[in-house]
Every structure is written in structure tokens, then in C-alpha cells.
């Protein structure tokens, strides 16, 4: 297992990495602005489960295949980016749903947020490449590397989930403030959708 010094180095490095805005954070903020705090938090949960699925792949050695294969990397990247763009388009098309739901005192549903978050988290190839390059550096070569990789990935995912949840709550609070004038939610939902479209486009273009 990693030594105490390796754990400290890992926790510090993970904290610094997590503070840099990435696809998961931008997706979470976009969801919070579009569908609200509760849905965004459930999306964070789903995203974390998707990331954990990637950790399992990396621990099993399959992550290295995706990282090394240009075709596999491109397929996963395009699938994930296309899905995020589709979510953004749907948010813009249905931008009045939040206002209408508020007027009707009932929530709108367009897919379970946990499932949506899982899909986004599991189809981000950048995370796989990151885990392949990052996690083994803190594993003890003399121990069970696969088990250590899974443990490190679990800790990283938990830290990222806490950070994303804080951002979701903050963005959800901003949305609640906008909701004092329900008509503003149309613009806010469209803004969140635009953020997700921009995120998806970035995922497509960045190598």
C-alpha cells in the first residue's frame, strides 16, 4: 500500500488538480443552472459513479488500451462530447420548462440525473488518460497495484464529488435567486445549455 508520504503527496496533488475547472465541474454548474440544485447533486453522484467505472477499467488494464489506441480514444471522446452537446440543446429547447414547472408546482423530468451524470462521467476519455498517468505514480510497486489504483481512484473521486457538490450548491443558490422572477429562468436555462454545448464542442476539438 502507499506510504504515508505518498498519501500526503497524492492528496495534495489531487486537491490541486480538482481545483482546475474541468468537464465534470462545468457540466455540474450547467446542470445546476438549468435544472436546479437537487438535480445537479444527483448528476454529481452519477458522474462519480461513471468515474469509478473508469477507475475499474484503469485498474484492470483496459484504461491503458484506450489511452494508447487513437481509435478507441476518439470513439469515446466523440460519444461523450455528442451527448453533452445534446443535453445542452435540449436545455435550450426546453428553457421554459423550469418556469412552467414552478408555476404548476411540479418538477419537470427529462431523464434521470444519475443516469445522465453517469453517462457523462463514463464517456470522458480525458479522465481515463489522466488516471493511467496519475494514479500509478502513488502506488507501491511491491504491492497489489490494481487494488491500490482502485483505492486511490476512489479517494480521488470522493474528493472531486465533494468539490463538485459545493459548486452545485452555489450555482443552485444563484438559480434560486433568479427564480424570484420566474421569467428569468428561461434565460438562465438557456445559459446553462449554452455552457454544456460549449463544453461538448471543446471536448471534440481538444486533443
What are these regions (language model features)?
Residues 67-99, 157, 163-167, 175-207:
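Selective transmembrane alpha-helices of multi-pass membrane proteins
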Residues 91-120, 179:
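Cytosolic-biased juxtamembrane loops and peripheral soluble domains of multi-pass membrane proteins
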Residues 5, 108-112, 125:
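Juxtamembrane cytosolic amphipathic helices that cap and anchor the N-termini
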Residues 16, 20, 53, 119-126, ...:
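Residue-level hotspots within pore-lining transmembrane alpha-helices
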Residues 48-53, 114-127, 189-192:
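Select subsegments of transmembrane alpha-helices in polytopic membrane proteins
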Residues 55-59, 123-128, 195-207:
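Hydrophobic alpha-helical transmembrane segments in multi-pass integral membrane proteins
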Amino acid at each position: 500500500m502507499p506510504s504515508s508520504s505518498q498519501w500526503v503527496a497524492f492528496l495534495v496533488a489531487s486537491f490541486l488538480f480538482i481545483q482546475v475547472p474541468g468537464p465534470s465541474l462545468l457540466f455540474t454548474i450547467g446542470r445546476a443552472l438549468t435544472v436546479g440544485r437537487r438535480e445537479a447533486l444527483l448528476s454529481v453522484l452519477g458522474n462519480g459513479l461513471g468515474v469509478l467505472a473508469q477507475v475499474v477499467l484503469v485498474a484492470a488494464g483496459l484504461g491503458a488500451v484506450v489511452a494508447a489506441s487513437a481509435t478507441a480514444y476518439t470513439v469515446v471522446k466523440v460519444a461523450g462530447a455528442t451527448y453533452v452537446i445534446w443535453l445542452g440543446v435540449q436545455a435550450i429547447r426546453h428553457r421554459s420548462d423550469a418556469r412552467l414547472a414552478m408555476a404548476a408546482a411540479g418538477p419537470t423530468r427529462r431523464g434521470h440525473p444519475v443516469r445522465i451524470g453517469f453517462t457523462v462521467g463514463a464517456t470522458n476519455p480525458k479522465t481515463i488518460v489522466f488516471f493511467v498517468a496519475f494514479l500509478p505514480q502513488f502506488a507501491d510497486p511491491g504491492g497489489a497495484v490494481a487494488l491500490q489504483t482502485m483505492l486511490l481512484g476512489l479517494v480521488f473521486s470522493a474528493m472531486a464529488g465533494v468539490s463538485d457538490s459545493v459548486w452545485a450548491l452555489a450555482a443552485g443558490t444563484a438559480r434560486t435567486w433568479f427564480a424570484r422572477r420566474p421569467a428569468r429562468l428561461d434565460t438562465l436555462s438557456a445559459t446553462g445549455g449554452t455552457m454544456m454545448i460549449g463544453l461538448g464542442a471543446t471536448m471534440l476539438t481538444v486533443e
